A protein has these predicted regions:
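Short, solvent-exposed alpha-helical surface patches in well-structured domains
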Residues: 89-92, 188, 201
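Acidic/histidine-enriched, glycine/proline-rich intrinsically disordered or flexible terminal extensions
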Residues: 206-221
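A generic structural-conservation signal
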Residues: 29, 156, 182, 202-203
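GST-like fold's C-terminal all-alpha helical module
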Residues: 97-195
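Positions that flank functional sites
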Residues: 34-35, 158, 208-209
Length: 221
């Protein structure tokens, strides 16, 4: 069986988990306290990051590289299109959420509100929290613009771009940091994607000391 070293609220780990589940690949989940920087963890990935996927004796790192590896091995269902323009758009949007959105929103809200506390790094920086809360409004507007022109974020079919975005939004939704009233279009998109069977384990996540809001695992929120 595959083994995934992960952190429950990490959007990068969630993206890989969604990819695995959508392709019906079973994996043992091993919670990794990456901030403790244990010697075993350092041997698994000297970069000191999760996720790490153990497969056929190899330790795969970097979430996008893992997802592309899984796509090559298990192309059905397709999450990264083969047509160059469509493939580009999926990769562009995965990059958007994993780089720009993470830097401007997820890292400021999730890190400050949760990671700092569970890793013993002190109290939230209110300036960062305010910046993250302000920045997410722009990103929701951009997503609304995309979704008014397409069925899914990158085109007419659901793709890894949707999973990348949903991985970030689900982590933020766990800590009640998404104002779903800002866009019914984005809310409908999220309700649609969280209803997929691949999302079940994500919605079952529990982080000690941080209970999710009641709507977190409600498919009709």
């Amino acid at each position: 069986m595959l083994r995934l070293y992960h952190s429950a609220l990490s959007p990068f780990c969630r993206k890989v988990r969604l990819c695995l589940a959508e392709k019906r690949l079973e994996a043992e989940l091993v919670e990794e306290k990456y901030w403790e920087k244990s010697s075993d963890f350092a041997r698994r990935n000297p970069a000191g990051k999760v996720p790490i996927l153990r497969i056929e004796g190899k330790a795969l790192t970097e979430s996008m590289a893992i997802c592309e590896y899984l796509e090559d091995l298990h192309p059905d269902p397709e999450l990264i299109p083969k047509a160059p323009e469509e493939r580009y758009e999926v990769r562009r949007l995965v990059g958007w959420f994993d780089d720009k959105f993470h830097q401007e929103v997820t890292s400021k809200l999730l890190y400050e509100r949760v990671i700092k506390k569970i890793s013993g790094q002190g109290f939230p920086d209110s300036k960062n929290v305010k910046e993250g809360a302000r920045s997410i409004k722009f990103h929701i507007s951009y997503m609304e613009w995309l979704l008014e022109r397409r069925r899914w974020l990158a085109g007419e079919d659901m793709s890894l771009a949707d999973f990348a975005a949903a991985a970030h939004f689900s982590a933020l939704d766990y800590i009640s940091d998404v104002d779903w009233t800002r866009s019914h279009v984005v809310k409908d998109w999220y309700a649609k994607i969280k209803s997929r069977p691949a999302f079940r384990s994500i919605l079952a996540d529990q982080v000690s000391g941080f209970p999710p809001p009641l709507h977190y695992n409600d498919l009709d929120f």
